[in-house]
Amino acid sequence: MSALIPASEVILRHQDTFSDKQVVIAGDVQDLLPARLEARSVKVHTAWFHHRQTLARALGEQAVQFGLVADAALGGGCDTLIYYWPKNKPEALFQLTNLLSLLPLGCDVFVVGENRSGVRSAEPMLAAWCPLAKIDSARRCGLYHGELVQQPRFDAEAFWQSYQLEDVVIKTLPGVFSRDGLDNGSQLLLSTFDRPFQGHVADIGCGTGVLSAVLAKGAAGVQLTLSDAHAPALAASRATLAVNGLQGEVLAGDVYSAISGRFDMIISNPPFHDGMQTNLKAAETLIRGALNHLRIGGELRIVANAFLPYPDLLDAVFGNHQVLVQNGRFKVYQAIHQVKRSRDKGPKRR
């Protein structure tokens, strides 16, 4: 999170605009621009746990909010919003409706993002609340500015959706992976569970909680720990467990950062993007750290795009792997913890 992304470089072209402003920065914040921006004050809202950790170290705990929604304290005294447009338009609508409902009329609003992310959609989206005009174009990004003329009404409940998988209800929110239905990769992974599983399961990068919910529904012997870095995913997973009458611990964390102890199985459909960029770091951390969180005989079972270079890494870490099932796009990998490394302990929260 050290180098600035192109959108931040565009913001810094307008540094003088912010020198006497009280700024809130939100949206898809991926770097330390909030710490480098010269302003009267800077506060941040992020929906990503790992970015929250980095920004809190740079700005202080009180300057950074992490969560599904921003609260009124964030907007207090603010006269400027800088919003980083995410790649997901419904998530942008959710976040901007929330943020603009908290900010005072007359607040300056800047929206910045890569052209390929669809940042042009900001103009029609905000037309009724904050008419925007494009004020800069550089680094394949657009920067838009407007003034808040009407506060939107924000109702988080109105953004919830759900879908059904046989007798399992999946709850979901804007920005959560596979919001509109079960993705093909997760479907392939679930197809490998052809008999009830018993034991402690860690669902890393849990998203909607679909993997855990399907695995645990009707299987009384499953104990669940779910973790994700994305606040909407955490909310969706908690809601999915609740609506299906399932118990489980849902933790905000970056891969294994929130959990300790050992499990009988780790399951995941790991992401390979960070914003608009390809990034295999999370999946590599998942694989490299798995032995520290598996009991002897425990397994890592993940689904991944077939072209991703995971077989060699699995062999290097586990000394084994097999492909349980594959189709044209995806493979489900299984690797078994066969070598005793330290005394096993049940999963627990740090």
UniProtKB/Swiss-Prot annotation:
Pfam families: MTS, MTS_N
Reaction(s) the record says it catalyses: guanosine(1207) in 16S rRNA + S-adenosyl-L-methionine = N(2)-methylguanosine(1207) in 16S rRNA + S-adenosyl-L-homocysteine + H(+)
Statement: the UniProt record of this protein carries the keyword Methyltransferase: yes
Class of this enzyme: transferase
Annotated InterPro entries: DNA_methylase_N6_adenine_CS, Mtase_sm_N, rRNA_ssu_MeTfrase_C, RsmC/RlmG, SAM-dependent_MTases_sf, Small_mtfrase_dom
GO cellular component, one term: cytoplasm
Keywords, comma-separated and alphabetical: Cytoplasm, Methyltransferase, rRNA processing, S-adenosyl-L-methionine, Transferase
A GO term for molecular function: 16S rRNA (guanine(1207)-N(2))-methyltransferase activity
E.C. numbers: 2.1.1.172
Location within or outside the cell: Cytoplasm
Main localization category: cytoplasm
Assembly information from the UniProt record: Monomer.
Protein family (similarity comment): Belongs to the methyltransferase superfamily. RsmC family.
Functional description taken from the UniProt entry: Specifically methylates the guanine in position 1207 of 16S rRNA in the 30S particle.
Name the record gives this protein: Ribosomal RNA small subunit methyltransferase C
Species name: Sodalis glossinidius (strain morsitans)
Gene that encodes the chain: rsmC
